[in-house]
Amino acid sequence: MSGTLTFTAVTSGGVAYDVDFPLHPLTRSSQGVSDLLTALLETISSHVEKRRDLSDGDILQALCLTLAVRARMVAASPESARELVIELFDAAHRAACAASPYEAGRA
């Protein structure tokens, strides 16, 4: 499966981004990817609310450490896993940077 995952991210300040993430051709479940992305972002937001001493850099560092651990746990050589991580990150980062910010509606 390949294609695009359209995902709306909203910051705590009410700025939204509609990101069109390209999916890897071997993606098994776009809905599963979307659900996990949502759960991870919600977990980060919840944790940050409780820990005001965390900086954006601290959050990015924790995510990188998590990614390194998960990449090491997959059934692939460390170099193959690293190459895949870089490929996936670069594509996702380009998509996120291409998304224009806008004010999210308030209910």
Regions found by a protein language model. Name each.
Residues M1-A107:
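Solvent-exposed interaction surfaces and binding hotspots enriched for charged
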